[in-house]
Structures are given as structure tokens and as C-alpha cells.
Amino acid sequence: QYYGCNAVPGGGLYVLSDPFGENPQLRNLLENSVVEKGRLKGRKLDSGTFLSPELSFDGKTILFAYTQAKAWAKYQGKTAYEWSPEYSYHIFRCNADGTGLVQLTDGSWNDFDPCFLPNGRIAFISERRGGYLRCGRHCPVYTLHSMADDGSDIIRLSHHETHEWHPSVANDGMLVYTRWDYIDRDTNIAHHMWSCFPDGRDPRSYHGNYPQRRESRPW
């Protein structure tokens, strides 16, 4: 479960130069960068946690998720988890050299796993649709969304009731992702690959939709 409240501060966005040579070099891409747009404008991203970097098709732009990873009091005396922007993941964009750093999403929910779409939009995973897991009522659900490349026009692509992860674009232009689907089946075996059109239409499972029972698997 990719919740910013579970993240430990540390790390960064790095590039490994000459990775297969005799002297590979690791470089902090954002070492001299400050956020140019968004709630964290004017600040460096040097004290939080990074997740799911994504390179554009032309190799010029990078998307990633970042949380400030501030301290969080579990449950806060309530029956459901409630986040604040300071310990939620948000999506950022920068140029391949680390310049042009801007914040695209914000709010009291986690946004992560950004993915460039061929039509210029960005697919990502978000808790914005609302709802909680059936087997963990206090845990917010995150599913497929998309937005314009400047963070505007956010659209929900999936209404599924449990988590989805890792969107990517297949060679035929379809959006491929994983989904936790345990309706009428065991809880922990159905994290399989699904596909849909980039606008969310026609979600389908590649594997069929009736996996074996957990007890019948060799592990």
C-alpha cells in the first residue's frame, strides 16, 4: 500500500552515468533545483521520499511522486485514515537535466505511479475517487486517473473498489496496469494484469477472471 505516511525520509532522484563502464557515476538530478510551481514553490525536494520515476517517450521529461514524509499519528482517534498534504505523495515534473521542476498535483490524498500517454495526457494512480477497502475499512482505495500535462483536468478512469497500480502503455496504445480484484475469490492471489483504453473504457483482464484458489497453488 503506497501511503506517504509509511514513507521514511531519504533518497532522491538520481541518474547513473556510464552504467556499464568501468567508472559509473551517480548524480543527484535535483541537487540544485527548487520547485517553480505549486504549494512547495521555492523549496528543494531534499528531505522527503521519492517514488515511481517515469521518463517521457522523447527522453526529455521526467515525472515522479514525492512526499515530504512528515510524522503522522495513526488513526488520529478516527475510524478511517485521513491524510494531510505533508505526508501524501504528489506528482512532480522536471526536465531530464533536473531543471523546470514543478508540482502537478496536491491535496490530502496520495497520487503516484505517473505514466505518459501518447495523447499528451498523464495517467496516474490516486485516492481521489474516495472509498475504502472491504477488508481494511480504514484504508483508502487508489485507482486509475488521468490529467493534462500541467496537472489540470483530472479525470477518474476507474471506479474499481480495490487498489490498482503501475499503469504503462502497450505497443497497441492500450493502458496496461495491475489490479487487486478479489470479488468472489481469495483475497491475496488476484493482483493480475488488466488493460483498458486510455480514457478508461473497456477494462479487461488478460488472465481470464477466475484464478485458482490460494490453497491449490504450490507455494
What are these regions (language model features)?
Residues 1-43, 68-87, 92-96:
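Beta-propeller domains
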Residues 16, 65, 94, 123-125, ...:
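Residue-level marker for isolated small/hydroxyl-bearing positions within beta-strands
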Residues 20-48, 95-110, 147-162, 197-217:
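Multi-bladed beta-propeller domains
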Residues 46-55, 61, 109-122, 161-176, ...:
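Conserved beta-propeller blade repeats
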Residues 168-174, 179-190, 195-219:
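WD40 beta-propeller repeat blades
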Residues 9-18, 82-97, 139-151, 190-201:
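Beta-propeller blade signature
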Residues 1-8, 65-88, 124-140, 177-191:
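Short, conserved, GDST-rich strand-edge loop motifs in beta-rich repeat architectures
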Residues 59-65, 69-71, 86-106, 110-111:
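A conserved hydrophobic secondary-structure block that centers on an alpha-helix together
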